Amino acid sequence: MFTALSNLVMRPCLLLLALGLSVSPDASALQRGGVPGASMRSILLASPSAPNRLGPRQLWIGRSTSAIVTSIATPAEAVPGFIPGVGGLALVLSIVVEETQEEELFTLFVPSTPPGVERPMLVAFHGFNVSHLDIWANTSFISECQARGWFLIAPYMRNLAPTGPGTSQSGFGSAQSQLHVQAVMRYVMEGFPVDLDRIYGVGFSMGGGAAMSYAARHRDRDEGAFAAVVNHTGTVALQHVYANADNDTQGLMRRIFGGNPQYAPFNYNRSSVIELDANGVLVPDGDHMARNLSEVPVRTYYGVGDGQGYLVDEALQLDGFMSTISSTHELVALPADCSPAQGGHCWGTIDETEVCDWLETKVLGTPGQIGQVLADRNARWGNLDVTSTLAGVFSSFDYSISSSQNSIRLLGSSNLESVRFNLNEVGLDRSSPIGLRLGTADGSGDTVHITGYGGAPSSIVRNGWLVIEDCSSASLPRWCYDPSTDTLSITETAPQTALWTVNP
C-alpha cells in the first residue's frame, strides 16, 4: 500500500546507539531490582549548564528503559545533519502509558536553551510501516529544531492490535494510538519548558492523517492543542483509505478499528478529518472532524505525480471542505522529489525549512466565539467541556458567544448530555443579565453548567416566564445553583429552541 522502509522497523538497541544513547541490555532486570537513575528532568534542568555540555549520565525513564545520556553535538556526526557547536540532545525514550499500561517509544530532541525558557515544540508523525526513527532518518526536522531552539518529539504511535511482525508501528491514528501520543506529549510538557501556545504538528502519509486527526480531537491548550498543522499527503479519510488498500492493509485496519467501515464507521471516522465514500466523494453532512479546525492554520502538501493518487484526491477533497468552513487552509502542490522505488510518495517532496518557517509564524489563539464542535468522546473542546449522552456516537452542536451582547447560543445539538464552561473564560459578565439560547436537533434536551458564577442569580426567566429554582432530576426545564462548586446549571428538555435570561 505505502512505500515501506524496512530498514526502520524497530530495532531499539541498535538505533539508540546512533542517537547517542546506550540502553541497558536487561532493562527488565533494572525494573525488578528498582535501580533508579536520576530523573530526566533533574539531569537536564537542574544545572544552568547547557545540555550539550553534559557528560554521560545514567538515566532512568519510566519503569522499563534505562539509558545513558551523552551529548550529540560533540561530535556533531552522532546524528546526521546536526549543526556543529549548536548543541542539544537527541534521545530515544520509553514510557508506560497509564491508560493502556503498555510501552510507547519516542524520539525527543531537547534544545540547548537556558533552563526555564519556554520554547516551541514540533510533534512529528511518521508514515506507514516505519517507526518514530523515520523522522530522524528521512527528514531534517531534528536539525531544524536544533537551529531554532525547538523541542521535537516523534512518537512511535504504537498499535496494540497488530496483525503480524512490524505492524505495531502502523496505527492509522486510531484513538488508542493517540492515547500513546498524548501520554508522550504530557510527559514532555510536564518535564520541560514547552511553550503551550506554539506546539505544532507535522506528518507524512499515514502520519499526515494522524497529525490532522490528533489536531481535530485535541483542542485543549493545557493538553497540547496544536497551533498549526502541516499535512503531507495524509490519510485523512480512512474509509476511503480502506477502499483503496491492499488485502493485508485492510486486514490490519479491520483489526485496529473493530471491523470494516460498514461495520464500525464511528471508529474510522473518529480518526479521520473528513468522510468520503468509497468513490472519494465528500459525504454531505458527514462526520467531518475537520469542523474542529476552522480556526487552526493547516497547510496540506501533495506531490504532483504521487503514485498514491487516492491520497492526492483526499488532499483535494480536504481543501474543498476546509474552504467552506475556514480561511486558514492552504494547499501546496510540488514536484515529487523521490527515488524511483518510492513512486513519488515520500517525505522529500517538502522542504523542512520552509515548513518550519511557516509554522514559526503561528501562535495558538483564544478559542473562537463562533464555531462547531464534533466530539467523539467526553473532553474539553476549546473553552467548552462536552459530555455525550451515549458513548460511541458523535456529539455535535453549533455555538456562538457574544461578549457585547453577554450571551451564548448552543444550537443544533445531537447526542449532547451537557456543556460546561467558566463564565470568565468565555468572556461573559455576571453583573449584567446573561442570555442563553438553547436548541437541539434530536429533541433530547441539554444541560448547561456555568462555573464561576459567584452566587445564586436573583431570578431566571425562560421564554418570558419566571422559572423557580429546582434541583431535582425532573424531566422539566429547570435550573439549580450549587454553592459548593459555584456552578449554575440550566437544563432544557423541550425540543424547541428556548431563550433563557439569567438575572444577576
Task: Put a short name on every predicted segment.
Residues 30-119, 466-470, 476-480:
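A domain-start/cap signature at the N-terminus of enzymes
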Residues 114-119, 124-164, 239, 308:
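Short substrate-entry loop that stabilizes the transition state in hydrolases
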Residues 130, 189-191, 196-248:
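Primarily recognizes the serine-hydrolase "nucleophile elbow" in alpha/beta-hydrolase
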Residues 134, 226-290:
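Mobile cap/lid helix-loop segments that gate and shape the active-site cleft of serine hydrolases
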Residues 171-192:
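Alpha/beta-hydrolase active-site loop
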Residues 299-301, 305-415:
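C-terminal catalytic histidine-bearing segment of alpha/beta-hydrolase fold enzymes
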Residues 414-456:
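Surface-exposed beta-strand/loop patches in extracellular or lumenal glycoproteins
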Residues 475-504:
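C-terminal beta-strand-rich structural cap/linker in extracellular carbohydrate-active enzymes
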